[in-house]
Amino acid sequence: MQKITPFLWYNGHVEEAVALYTSVFPNSKVLNSSPMSATVEIEGQQLIIFNGGAHYALTPAASLYVNCDTQAEVDRLWAQLVEGGAESRCGWLVDRFGLSWQIIPTILPKLLQDPDRAKAKRAMDAMLTMGKIDIAALESAARG
């Protein structure tokens, strides 16, 4: 079986991005690094980060999706990754290097896929008002 590894084209700052990502995720390591590129492993997922220049830009059309078990984890990751970047909607943010992340509590897909469609709609409506996802507010909205 072939291995699929995301290849991310950055406009400089590869070393700074690698330093941020490996500091934010405790289960991460740098596999190799040069001024042009680095390969990192974050929570078992390898990423190649390439210093390709301004020819191409990262876009929210591709993002890294992070499952979070607790609000504390959502809060910590959100704060560290959004610093110098930008908040977006529905759990999305863009870090200071232009990479989009989805910081999503594990309860969110469960609520959105609830067989009680009214409950799922209430959760969806609540999520659509949020930047960073608030688990307690989602659960409260889902309950009605």
Model regions: which residues?
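N-terminal beta-strand motif that seeds the catalytic metal site of vicinal oxygen chelate
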Residues: 1-19, 24-32, 63-64, 107-144
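Short, electropositive, low-hydrophobicity segments enriched in small/polar residues
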Residues: 16, 48, 95
